[in-house]
């Protein structure tokens, strides 16, 4: 049975201007429906391997009516140029037909999820696992609250201690670096003494 000219044109448009031979399996992404593989097989009747470029639609025009399986495929978004514009047989655009865009969700019972759908599902599961790991069990919550309170008390003590050191007298603040130097010298002296 010979193919209709519109089928040849749509296959030409999908394959970039050339039909694939029947011996070679088509190059489809993993997980594509098998119905697409049988639809995009080569030309079994031996008609020419080139598309008719003299057609009114031209070699790069969108197909007039895609097959029933092409609209379900995630690759259909690359075949169709606009969901609002359609070409009639004369090659002019018309707004008469109502074409709704293909649904973006994946049907879990008939096909594997598309890569964007897989990435989104992975993101959701990763966010859920992060939330679960951030929630502490009931046993650790009192200890964490006590640790936070101790840290707050320590921060307040450090803040008040540094204020007192600089507020009392500037001489004491000036003597402070000398004490640090004396302690450093004492530490060095102990290291040297232990080595001998």
Curated annotation (Swiss-Prot):
Ubl conjugation among keywords: yes
The organs and tissues expressing this protein are described as:
Widely expressed.
Residue span of motif BH3: 146-160
Post-translational changes noted in the entry: Phosphorylation at Ser-65 by MAPK1/MAPK3 leads interaction with TRIM2 and ubiquitination, followed by proteasomal degradation. Deubiquitination catalyzed by USP27X stabilizes the protein. Ubiquitination by TRIM2 following phosphorylation by MAPK1/MAPK3 leads to proteasomal degradation. Conversely, deubiquitination catalyzed by USP27X stabilizes the protein.
Whether Ligase counts among this entry's keywords is: no
Topology with respect to the bilayer? Peripheral membrane protein
Write the record's keywords in alphabetical order, separated by commas: Apoptosis, Membrane, Mitochondrion, Phosphoprotein, Ubl conjugation
GO cellular component terms, A-Z: Bcl-2 family protein complex; cytoplasm; cytosol; intracellular membrane-bounded organelle; membrane; mitochondrion
Gene Ontology terms for molecular function: microtubule binding; protein kinase binding
- Per the record, residues carrying Phosphoserine are 65, 73, 83, 90
InterPro entries attached to this UniProt entry: Apoptosis_Bim_N, Bcl-2-like_11, Bcl-x_interacting_BH3_dom, Immune_Signaling-Apoptosis_Reg
Q: Where is this protein localized, as stated in its record? A: Membrane; Mitochondrion
Q: Where is the composition biased (Polar residues)?
A: 34-43
Disordered: annotated segments: 1-68, 90-114
What is an annotated GO biological process for this record, any one?
Answer: ear development
* Family from the record: Belongs to the Bcl-2 family.
Q: What function does the entry list?
A: Induces apoptosis and anoikis.
Domains as described in the record = The BH3 motif is required for the interaction with Bcl-2 proteins and cytotoxicity.
Q: What quaternary arrangement does the UniProt entry report?
A: Forms heterodimers with a number of antiapoptotic Bcl-2 proteins, including MCL1, BCL2, BCL2L1 isoform Bcl-X(L), BCL2A1/BFL-1, and BCL2L2/BCLW. Does not heterodimerize with proapoptotic proteins such as BAD, BOK or BAK. Identified in a complex containing BCL2L11, DYNLL1 and BCL2L1 isoform Bcl-X(L); BH3 integrity is required for BCL2L1-binding. Interacts with YWHAZ. When phosphorylated, interacts with TRIM2; this interaction is associated with ubiquitination and degradation. Interacts (via BH3) with MCL1; this interaction may sequester BCL2L11 and prevent its pro-apoptotic activity.
UniProt cross-references to PANTHER family, sorted A to Z: BCL-2-LIKE PROTEIN 11 (PTHR12044:SF9), BCL2 INTERACTING MEDIATOR OF CELL DEATH (PTHR12044)
Q: This protein is called what?
A: Bcl-2-like protein 11
């Amino acid at each position: 049975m010979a193919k209709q000219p519109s089928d040849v044109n749509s296959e030409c448009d999908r394959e970039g201007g050339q039909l694939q031979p029947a011996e070679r399996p088509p190059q489809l992404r993993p997980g594509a429906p098998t119905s697409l593989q049988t639809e995009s097989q080569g030309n079994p009747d031996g008609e020419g391997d080139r598309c008719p470029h003299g057609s009114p639609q031209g070699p790069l025009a969108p197909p007039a009516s895609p097959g029933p399986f092409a609209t379900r495929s995630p690759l259909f978004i690359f075949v169709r140029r606009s969901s609002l514009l359609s070409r009639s047989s004369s090659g002019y655009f018309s707004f008469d037909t109502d074409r709704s865009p293909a649904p973006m969700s994946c049907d879990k019972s008939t096909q594997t999820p598309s890569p964007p759908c897989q990435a989104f599902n992975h993101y959701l599961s990763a966010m859920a696992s992060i939330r679960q790991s951030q929630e502490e069990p009931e046993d650790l919550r009192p200890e964490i609250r006590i640790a936070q309170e101790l840290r707050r008390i320590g921060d307040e003590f450090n803040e008040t201690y540094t204020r007192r050191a600089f507020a009392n007298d500037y001489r004491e603040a000036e003597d402070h670096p000398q004490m640090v130097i004396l302690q450093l010298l004492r530490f060095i002296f102990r290291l040297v003494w232990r080595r001998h």
